[in-house]
UniProtKB/Swiss-Prot annotation:
Pfam families: ATP-synt_ab, ATP-synt_ab_C, ATP-synt_ab_N
Enzyme class: translocase
Main localization of the protein described in the UniProt heading: membrane
Domain of life of the organism encoding this protein: Bacteria
Keywords: ATP synthesis, ATP-binding, Cell inner membrane, Cell membrane, CF(1), Hydrogen ion transport, Ion transport, Membrane, Nucleotide-binding, Translocase, Transport
NCBIfam families: atpA (TIGR00962), PRK13343.1 (NF009884)
Record's GO cellular component terms: plasma membrane; proton-transporting ATP synthase complex
Protein name (record): ATP synthase subunit alpha
Described function: Produces ATP from ADP in the presence of a proton gradient across the membrane. The alpha chain is a regulatory subunit.
Subunit organization: F-type ATPases have 2 components, CF(1) - the catalytic core - and CF(0) - the membrane proton channel. CF(1) has five subunits: alpha(3), beta(3), gamma(1), delta(1), epsilon(1). CF(0) has three main subunits: a(1), b(2) and c(9-12). The alpha and beta chains form an alternating ring which encloses part of the gamma chain. CF(1) is attached to CF(0) by a central stalk formed by the gamma and epsilon chains, while a peripheral stalk is formed by the delta and b chains.
Covalent S-S links between cysteines: none
Position of the signal peptide: none
Lineage, broadest ranks: Bacteria, Pseudomonadati, Pseudomonadota, Gammaproteobacteria, Alteromonadales
């Protein structure tokens, strides 16, 4: 069959009409240098601060320096095979991480990818790692407690839901142990937990995960890991990623607790990135915005009011407040709390738990220094019975610390001073607590009642710990109803005082101490 010229022209015209040109505009640039995880890119226009840049091999970098002719970006992951001249693409997206209940019980990296070998994670969507903190109008005052199960903290340095309480001290002194005990104590309280491990050894993180699993708290916890072997960018971003995962619960009218272990290592990672980006160094070679690094993170831990939750959930959740409580950890060098990063974080947070190495070495664990530890907002949230009975504990310890120094020089002490010294020694012994053995409100109250009402006065100092263990066992067996009432209501009145007094008198009559 032969076609004439008219038919050929018609066919060509039809083909041209049907031809669909898909134009794709790409924002592309070229790598001009690669230095220790920092890449400099030319030709990349219209890039946002913090934008994800797609690299060869399904990797991403984050734009941090936006200069007139080039972009400085930090690579999130391995960078050894990146080379000058390779093409990169702008994505127009800010870094997001998966959020939702599916993350509970899982161990993930900074990007929210599972690293525990338990398969993919079902998420409820994605959330940007950098989010503006709730405003003043959206917040509610802190008035509900977070029970850590550690009697020295619950009695003297109470923590409320939505508070930021710093844990500060030298290395290997029990900072992480306090945070872990607090997480383990939340397994039946409805508070979800997030543990962010920054710059730690993989073996240390494995031990943490194992401990949480053994004590039944892993199913209620998200573990975010940026280990010491990972890129500085991932260590810098890990706390923000963990915070976004915690905000998922806060914004839906639930309560969450997040532990940053530790922010000193995050500051070091950020210092490394900043120096490689040639930003001007300041005090201790940290960049000028290292305060903002931590303030914008810790301000996201807050108690939000009912209106905020209702607006966020489009009316699905009504009459509920949400909270995100933060326990940031800072490591000091030889007890120097006046260094740059420690002073910054102390000024940002609502109080600090200061751990001292000489207390730790003398067997007082947790090694909390009651004199300079403080909770600025937690007092309003403290359980009534703990508040009433714990008031004299801090005073007894303060007086003991003052008198102990004086007693070293004076041999003949009057009876009142000697009684005060011995009471202080017994209270110090009473504040000791083993790791992974959090106490209920009632158990803490019973211990404080024994100290406050003089039931320890005739107990030998080296028997105080045994006395307390036996007392708790007796109360849970013989006074189960009273303990349940205290745990449920947390009230303190004359009836409860009389019941506790009778119970302790009966207990002390069973054996001599």
């Amino acid at each position: 069959m032969q076609l004439n010229s008219t038919e050929i022209a018609e066919l060509i015209k039809n083909r041209i009409e049907q031809f669909n040109v898909v134009s794709e505009a790409r924002n592309e640039g070229t790598i001009v240098s690669v230095t220790d995880g920092i890449i400099r890119i030319n030709g990349l226009a219209d890039v946002m601060q913090g934008e994800m840049i797609e690299l060869p091999g399904s990797r991403f970098a984050i734009a941090l320096n936006l200069d007139r002719d080039s972009v400085g970006a930090v690579v999130m992951g391995p960078y050894a095979d990146l080379a000058e001249g390779q093409k990169v693409k702008g994505t127009g997206r800010i870094l997001e991480v998966p959020v939702g209940r599916g993350l509970l019980g899982r161990v993930v990296n900074t990007l929210g990818e599972p690293i525990d070998g338990k398969g993919p994670i079902e998420n409820d969507g994605f959330s940007p790692v950098e989010v503006i903190a709730p405003g003043v109008i959206d917040r509610k005052s802190v008035d509900e407690p977070v029970q850590t199960g550690i009697k020295s903290i619950d009695a003297m340095i109470p923590i409320g839901r939505g508070q930021r309480e710093l844990i500060i001290g030298d290395r290997q002194i029990g900072k992480s142990a306090i945070a872990l005990d607090a997480i383990i104590n939340q397994k039946n309280t409805g508070i979800k937990s997030i543990y962010v491990a920054i710059g730690q050894k993989a073996s240390t993180v494995a031990n943490v995960v194992r401990s949480l699993e053994e004590h039944g708290a892993l199913s209620n916890t998200i573990v975010v890991v940026a280990s010491a072997s990972e890129a500085a960018a991932l260590q810098y971003l890990a706390p923000y990623a963990g915070c976004s995962m915690g905000e998922y619960f806060r914004d839906r009218g639930e309560d969450a607790l997040i532990v940053y272990d530790d922010l000193s290592k995050q500051a070091v990672a950020y210092r490394q990135i900043s120096l490689l980006l040639r930003r001007p160094p300041g005090r201790e070679a940290y960049p000028g915005d290292v305060f903002y690094l931590h303030s914008r993170l810790l301000e996201r831990a807050a108690r939000v009011n009912e209106a905020y939750v209702e607006k966020f959930t489009n009316g699905e959740v009504k009459g509920k407040t949400g909270s995100l409580t933060a326990l940031p950890i800072i490591e000091t060098q030889a007890g120097d709390v006046s260094a740059f990063v420690p002073t910054n974080v102390i000024s940002i947070t609502d109080g600090q738990i200061f751990l001292q190495s000489d207390l730790f070495n003398s067997g007082i664990r947790p090694a909390v220094n009651a004199g300079i530890s403080v909770s600025r907002v937690g007092g309003a949230a403290q359980t009534k019975i703990i508040k009433k009975l714990g008031g004299g504990i801090r005073l007894a310890l303060a007086q003991y610390a003052e008198l102990a120094a004086f007693a070293q020089f004076a041999s003949d002490l009057d009876d009142a001073t000697r009684a005060q010294l011995e009471h202080g020694q017994r209270v110090t012994e009473l504040m000791k607590q083993k790791q992974y053995s959090p106490l209920s409100i009632a158990e803490t109250a019973v211990s404080l009642f024994a100290a406050e009402k003089g039931f320890l006065n005739d107990v030998a100092i080296n028997k105080v710990v045994d006395f307390e263990e036996a007392l708790h066992a007796y109360m849970s067996n013989e006074q189960a109803a009273l303990m349940a009432t205290i745990n449920e209501k947390g009230d303190y009145n004359k009836d409860i005082e009389a019941s506790l007094k009778t119970a302790l008198e009966n207990f002390k009559s069973t054996q001599t101490w």
